[in-house]
C-alpha cells in the first residue's frame, strides 16, 4: 500500500500509453476504443484542457493596440474548477504607445513575451520605473496604479498578464483615471460636493482638468521625447538575482534546469523568488528544436498553464475519467491530444502525465499554480526517471514484461528530458515495428 500511495499505478499505465504513442506519433485520437481518425477540430472540442487563441475575448481594441481576456478556465468544464480564481490577459501595443494609468482589483503577474516595455508603478511616496525586456516578469499588487509604455520605434509589445482574483473570484476589473469614449474616469462617479471638497476647487475646474473626455481609448500614441524622458529613470531587471522583493526578474537569469541538443527548460520556483512565493506560482520557459520530444513526465502538485508563444507543438496528456456502468463506478484512462499554434493555451493538471513534441522550433511559457514543493517526475529518459527506481522484483509484478526486460527497455534511451521525437525503429512504410518492442508495450497496440 505504501508503494501505491507514493507512485500510483495509473501513472505507470499512463506512461505506457504515452510511450506506445511515441513509437508512432502520427497515431492520434483517444484511448478506450475511440476513432483513431478523429479530426484535430473534433479533438479540440472534446478537450476541456485546450484553449484556442480564439477563446480570448477582446476587452478593448484600437489602432494602437488591444487588451484581451481568456474565457474562464471553468466556464465549460468542472474539471478546472481549481482554476476559477485565475484569469489570463494578453496586452499588445504598437511602437511608441502608452497604456493609460489604472489599477486592477487583482494581483497581477506580468510577463513580457515580445518586445520591450517601460513599466511605471505609482505609490503614495513616489514611483518606480522599470525597463522590461523579453522574459522579464514582475508582480503588481492589487490596487497599485501603473502604466505601460512601448518605447521601441519599430517592434510591437506583447505582454501576458496572469491575474489572481480575490474580490470576486474569476472577475478582473481595471479602474482607469482618464475619461475615454469607452468609459469615463472613475472619479466622475463621485458627487460634485465630494469632489469640490476633496480638491478645494470649483466643479467646473475639476471637470475641465480631470474628467472631460480626452482620449479615444486607453491605449494612446506617445511622443518620442516624452518616452525618452521617462526612460532615463528606468531600472533594468536584475540578471544576477532571483530573490528581489519588488523588482523585475528574468526567466533566463540562471542556467536552464534541463538542457541538451534538443531543448532547454528554464524555471523559477516559489522557493527561489519571493514574488512567486507570495502567489504560490512557478514560471518556466520551454525552448525546443523542431522534431524534439519532451519525454513523458508529470508534476506532483502544480497545475501548469502552458502558452504557445512561438511555433507549433503536439501535446498528449493522459488523465482519468469516471465511468458508470450498470450502477458501478469505474475509472478509465483517456488521452487528450492537441496541436498547439501560437497563442493557444493548454492546462496540464497536477499528476497528469504529459509529453510534447515540437512540430517546429518552439517557445512556450508556463505558469504553474499551487507550485510550492512541486516535483517533476520523469517517466522516460536516462536521468530522473522514476520508473528506473522501481526494483526488478516489483517490475515483475507491475508490467507485462519481466523486470529484466523493463530494465533493458529503459536503458535504450541514453538522452534525458529532451529526445529525438522520431522513433528509430521505423520500417520502410513509416510505421513503428511492433516486433521490436518488448512485451511491455505490445499489449497497448
From Swiss-Prot:
Ranges for domain Cupin type-1: 49-207, 249-407
What the entry lists under Pfam families is as follows:
Cupin_1 (PF00190)
Which InterPro entries does UniProt cross-reference here? Cupin_1, RmlC-like_jellyroll, RmlC_Cupin_sf, Seed_Storage-Functional
**UniProt keyword tRNA-binding, yes or no:** no
Query: Listed GO molecular functions?
Result: identical protein binding; nutrient reservoir activity
Q: Give the SUPFAM superfamilies listed for this entry.
A: RmlC-like cupins (SSF51182)
Gene3D superfamilies reported in the protein's UniProt record: Jelly Rolls
Q: Which proteins does it associate with, and in what oligomeric form?
A: Homotrimer.
Q: What does this protein do?
A: Seed storage protein.
State the family it belongs to: Belongs to the 7S seed storage protein family.
Q: What is this protein called?
A: Canavalin
Taxon lineage? Eukaryota, Viridiplantae, Streptophyta, Embryophyta, Tracheophyta
